[in-house]
């Protein structure tokens, strides 16, 4: 059970940031703000959301993409991170699992996720 004051502080933090609705299996395009000395720039990371865990301020999601030479790259992002400039849902995937860790073992066409057509 959290302290009442901690809960009020966390609720105030959550009000500021609005995130789009997405789930595991969706393809996301994340804009990450990177500060290098005096300059700031936005770097984009595009991949499949393979897991969402936690709740409240501690909620995180894991995104996986295939990098150069077919090397898988996974990054974990806090939902309410200040470094996330933008989150865009590119495709809505059709999966039956909440955690898609089995995609780590798949290669090529076997690693694809079916898209929900509207």
UniProtKB/Swiss-Prot annotation:
PROSITE patterns: RIBOSOMAL_L19
Pfam families given in the database record: Ribosomal_L19
GO molecular function: structural constituent of ribosome
Gene Ontology CC: one annotated term: cytosolic large ribosomal subunit
Keywords: Ribonucleoprotein, Ribosomal protein
GO biological process: translation
Reported function: This protein is located at the 30S-50S ribosomal subunit interface and may play a role in the structure and function of the aminoacyl-tRNA binding site.
HAMAP family attached to this UniProt entry: Ribosomal_bL19
Recorded family membership: Belongs to the bacterial ribosomal protein bL19 family.
Record-linked PANTHER family: LARGE RIBOSOMAL SUBUNIT PROTEIN BL19M, RIBOSOMAL PROTEIN L19
Listed NCBIfam families: rplS_bact
Record's protein name: Large ribosomal subunit protein bL19
Organism of derivation: Helicobacter acinonychis (strain Sheeba)
Gene giving rise to this polypeptide: rplS
